[in-house]
């Protein structure tokens, strides 16, 4: 018996009883897309508006404004934003100013003398020093380190584990922006560059793409949501004259977005339907929705069409009436 006990002592393993683990609710920076204390990946093809989208979100977070209409306001937060592609003075700063950001709350780790990588101690030091609630690395390919093969799971896994622990320790959201590969026929989970361990470590994966039938319209669509019901896609416009504009919910899946099979024709059908039924004046919302269902128009598509047309909704005698804009 003594021999067995001695053997057990020599091979002692530190164990944690689940009985000692407190139950905590997931906290969110932007529900249901960006959880706090976790890794989120935002990916898309070059030129699809990933950086512009993130800077718009940063502007709202640093000023405490709702990110989009209907999102709850919050206290202004500090952000760490690292870019390996764009100039700070001629690109990032002007975009932040245009978006209305509080630039005093946006910090950049000075890596002029030494390139920043995922296993760099300066990353944790900066989070601790600033109390940042959001850390952005844009793009992730620029921060894995020259000696790391991003296609090898055994090299990527410890890096992702480390930053996941950083996010958990400091309760901040770490957002990794990445380009996608050119395998257009693959599922969304296999279109991110490098090892699948990137996406495996993330609790939320978002994809940005453009709508084929509308060159100014982009959509951010959830590809993975481990901590909340998968939210619907949200659209935004990058207009040469008006700049960035949120365009509301959009009825499309991530695989449809990546394959280019836009639902633009269904949206146009829904728009034509609304124009026809409302041509003679306002009608009750319930009546319109029932007629749309009979016509095979999905609720999300009807909602998108209503938003695009600017259909108004007015409550009269305990019912909502829809009407075309004057």
Model segments located where?
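Anion (oxyanion) recognition and catalysis
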Residues: 62, 164, 168, 293
């Amino acid at each position: 018996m003594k021999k067995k006990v001695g053997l057990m002592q020599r091979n002692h393993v530190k164990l944690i009883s689940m009985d000692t683990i407190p139950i905590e609710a997931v906290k969110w920076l932007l529900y249901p897309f960006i959880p706090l204390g976790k890794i989120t990946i935002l990916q898309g093809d070059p030129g699809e508006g990933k950086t512009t989208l993130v800077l718009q979100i940063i502007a709202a977070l640093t000023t405490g404004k709702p990110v989009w209409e209907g999102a709850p306001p919050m206290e202004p937060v500090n952000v760490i934003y690292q870019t390996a592609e764009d100039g700070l003075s001629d690109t990032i700063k002007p975009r932040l100013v245009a978006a209305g950001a509080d630039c005093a709350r946006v910090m950049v780790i000075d890596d002029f003398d030494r390139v920043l990588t995922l296993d760099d101690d300066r990353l944790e030091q900066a989070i601790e020093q600033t109390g940042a609630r959001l850390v952005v690395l844009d793009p992730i390919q620029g921060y894995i380190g020259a000696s790391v093969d991003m296609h090898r799971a055994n090299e990527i896994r410890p890096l992702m584990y480390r930053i996941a622990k950083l996010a958990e320790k400091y309760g901040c959201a770490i957002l990794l922006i990445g380009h996608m590969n050119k395998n257009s026929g693959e599922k969304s989970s296999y279109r991110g560059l490098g090892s699948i361990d990137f996406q495996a470590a993330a609790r939320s994966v978002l994809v940005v793409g453009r709508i084929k039938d509308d060159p100014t319209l982009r959509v951010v669509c959830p590809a993975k949501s481990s901590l909340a019901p998968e939210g619907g896609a949200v659209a935004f416009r990058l207009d040469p004259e008006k700049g960035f504009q949120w365009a509301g919910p959009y009825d499309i899946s991530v695989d449809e977005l990546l394959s280019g099979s836009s639902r633009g024709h269904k949206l146009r059908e829904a728009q034509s339907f609304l124009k026809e039924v409302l041509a003679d004046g306002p009608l009750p919302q319930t009546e319109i929705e029932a007629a749309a269902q009979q016509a095979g128009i999905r609720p999300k598509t009807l909602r998108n069409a209503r938003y695009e047309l600017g259909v108004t909704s007015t409550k009269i005698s305990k019912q909502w009436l829809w009407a075309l804009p004057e």
